[in-house]
Swiss-Prot record:
<dbReference type="InterPro" id="IPR050755">
    <property type="entry name" value="TRAFAC_YlqF/YawG_RiboMat"/>
</dbReference>
<feature type="domain" description="CP-type G">
    <location>
        <begin position="211"/>
        <end position="372"/>
    </location>
</feature>
<keyword id="KW-0690">Ribosome biogenesis</keyword>
<feature type="binding site">
    <location>
        <begin position="365"/>
        <end position="369"/>
    </location>
    <ligand>
        <name>GTP</name>
    </ligand>
</feature>
<comment type="function">
    <text>GTPase that associates with pre-60S ribosomal subunits in the nucleolus and is required for their nuclear export and maturation.</text>
</comment>
<dbReference type="Pfam" id="PF01926">
    <property type="entry name" value="MMR_HSR1"/>
</dbReference>
<dbReference type="InterPro" id="IPR012971">
    <property type="entry name" value="NOG2_N_dom"/>
</dbReference>
<dbReference type="InterPro" id="IPR030378">
    <property type="entry name" value="G_CP_dom"/>
</dbReference>
<keyword id="KW-0539">Nucleus</keyword>
<dbReference type="GO" id="GO:0005525">
    <property type="term" value="F:GTP binding"/>
</dbReference>
<dbReference type="GO" id="GO:0042254">
    <property type="term" value="P:ribosome biogenesis"/>
</dbReference>
<feature type="region of interest" description="Disordered">
    <location>
        <begin position="459"/>
        <end position="513"/>
    </location>
</feature>
<keyword id="KW-0547">Nucleotide-binding</keyword>
<feature type="region of interest" description="Disordered">
    <location>
        <begin position="1"/>
        <end position="23"/>
    </location>
</feature>
<protein>
    <recommendedName>
        <fullName>Nucleolar GTP-binding protein 2</fullName>
    </recommendedName>
</protein>
<feature type="compositionally biased region" description="Basic and acidic residues">
    <location>
        <begin position="468"/>
        <end position="486"/>
    </location>
</feature>
<dbReference type="Pfam" id="PF08153">
    <property type="entry name" value="NGP1NT"/>
</dbReference>
Length: 513
């Protein structure tokens, strides 16, 4: 009995519980059951033939004889699938036109709507050329003709061939540039603006690899979050990318997130949120794993988008924006742990990556992009944190721009100096205070300038771009941001004054008595 029990346990342990007398056809000493089933998988789906080669049993879908079938007599097979009257169509078109610019209205079931009929722009404009309106027949032919010769582009056949080949070559180059680089080939060109020569370092964030990463993130995302710097929201907004999404991907949701709102006064952040909310849903955010702001509002907004798309198993949320605006930091804040590499320098994120936030919500991190623009100077690009300061040549030439953007009192409080006349004097005073001197006691202008630029970009020096006047929440002096210690001190002084005022009437009554 012990031997049989051991044999039974051995079969269970090895997964061979079937009786040894029952075998699969083809199983022998050389092929076990698993190998025979694997080989039968390749033989399946073929026809069976006899010794003469005639087909005895046809393979699946090989037999030409079709069984007799009958289609159910239903008029829905031959009618229109979706029908709408002209009155309903015009009413829906008017309602769509009224709510089209409202960023808080979402159009559902876009795939089932005749968007070509609802789009007023496509229906209003005619694709045909208006030749007769510009030049009628009477001015070209007949007795009232105003010209003797027709206008032709070329005087000879050779000239026409050369001009055609040149135009075709230019068109092909433009098509190739737009297809490979997309938005990278588009620049904001206006009359009176010329493209100035810049250093190679100021073209960071414009490579083909970065734009390919951006397009992958946009194509894979259902909701796109554009991260802006609260100190300069309009400067760090990629206008060409937002226009591309509005025209090419209107079914994707785009929202703005004002990050680093802890570096500006509360009224400035509120004014920028009010101004940008007219275009897209906007949230104020402070990225921090331990002490964040706006995290609950952002998660609640993502849950609302998830509820809008109940038909999908999950939704993807992509983060785009300028370098060093805090895209990876926001993802770490939402996850409450470090899942993305972050650094106070631009270009830390090299490729896109997927992060799971919830069961139905996924996050996509994207490298920072810098759309090319002829309006942006080297100073503007540097002050937005796009370029690493240690790679900039002659950094002392950008210090006058910092002195214009920042208040004198903030610089005095940060570096504990006062009485400078210009940027050179400002750099020299900081160098001598910190002991950063070269041979002969000369100040290290380059090293101190890089330190000032890093302090400017990393928030150690208070500065911000003031919001539009009509969107200001309160009439306060720009840059008047109080530190927490000063606010607590003022609150304590006010409480002491109130206590003194309450004690004075009591003391007067005691004296009278």
């Amino acid at each position: 009995m012990g031997t049989g029990k051991k044999e039974k346990q051995r079969r269970i342990r090895e997964g061979n519980t079937k009786d040894g007398n029952l075998r699969v056809k083809g199983e022998n000493f050389y092929r076990d059951t698993k190998r025979v089933q694997f080989l039968n998988m390749y033989k399946g789906g073929r026809s069976v033939r006899n010794a003469k080669g005639d087909i005895i049993k046809a393979a699946p879908l090989q037999d030409t004889a079709a069984p007799t079938a009958r289609v159910a007599p239903d008029r829905r097979w031959f009618g229109n699938t979706r029908v709408i009257s002209q009155d309903s169509l015009s009413h829906f078109r008017e309602a769509l036109g009224e709510n089209k610019r409202d960023s808080y209205q979402v159009l559902l079931r876009r795939n089932k709507l005749p968007m070509s009929l609802l789009n007023e722009k496509d229906s209003a404009e005619s694709p045909t050329a208006k030749i007769l309106e510009t030049e009628p027949f009477e001015q070209t032919f007949g007795p009232k003709a105003q010209r003797k010769k027709p206008r032709i582009a070329a005087s000879s056949l050779e000239e026409l061939i050369s001009s055609t080949s040149t135009d075709n070559k230019t068109f092909e180059e433009k098509q190739e540039l737009d297809s490979t680089l997309g938005l990278m080939g588009k620049q904001e060109e206006e009359d009176g603006w010329t493209q100035a020569a810049k250093e190679a370092i100021f073209h960071k964030g414009q490579s083909k690899r970065i734009w390919n990463e951006l397009y992958k993130v946009i194509d894979s995302s259902d909701v796109v979050i554009h991260v802006l710097d609260a100190r300069d929201p309009l400067g760090t907004r990629c206008k060409s990318v937002t226009d591309y999404m509005t025209n090419e991907t209107p079914h994707k949701h785009l929202i703005y997130v004002l990050n680093k709102c802890d570096l500006v006064p509360t009224w400035v952040a509120a004014a920028w949120v009010k101004h940008l909310s007219k275009e897209r849903p906007t949230l104020a955010f402070h990225a921090s794993i331990t002490n964040s702001f706006g995290k609950g509002s952002l998660i609640q907004l993502l849950r609302q988008f998830s509820q809008l798309h109940k038909d999908r198993h999950q939704i993807s949320v992509g983060f785009i924006g300028y370098p060093n605006t805090g895209k990876s930091s926001i993802i770490n804040t939402l996850r409450k742990k470090k899942v993305c590499q972050v650094a106070p320098i631009p270009g830390e994120t090299k490729v896109w990556q997927y992060i799971t936030l919830m069961k139905r919500i996924f996050l996509i991190d994207c490298p920072g992009i810098v759309p090319p623009s002829s309006k942006d100077s080297e100073e503007d690009i540097l002050f937005r944190g796009v370029v690493r300061v240690e790679h900039v040549s002659h950094p002392e030439q950008y210090i006058p721009g910092i002195l214009k953007r920042c208040k004198r009192q903030h610089l005095e409080r940060t570096y504990e100096i006062s009485g400078w006349k210009d940027s050179v004097d400002f750099i020299e005073m900081i160098a001598r205070k910190q002991g950063r001197l070269l041979k002969g006691g000369e100040p290290d202008e380059s090293g101190v300038s890089k330190q000032i630029l890093n302090d400017f970009n990393r928030g150690k020096i208070p500065w911000f771009v003031p919001p539009p006047e009509k969107d200001k929440i309160e009439e306060k002096e720009p840059g008047d941001k109080k530190r927490p210690a000063e606010e607590n001190q003022e609150d304590q002084e006010e409480e002491e004054k109130e206590q003194e005022e309450q004690e004075e009437p009591v003391s007067k009554k005691a004296k009278k008595e």
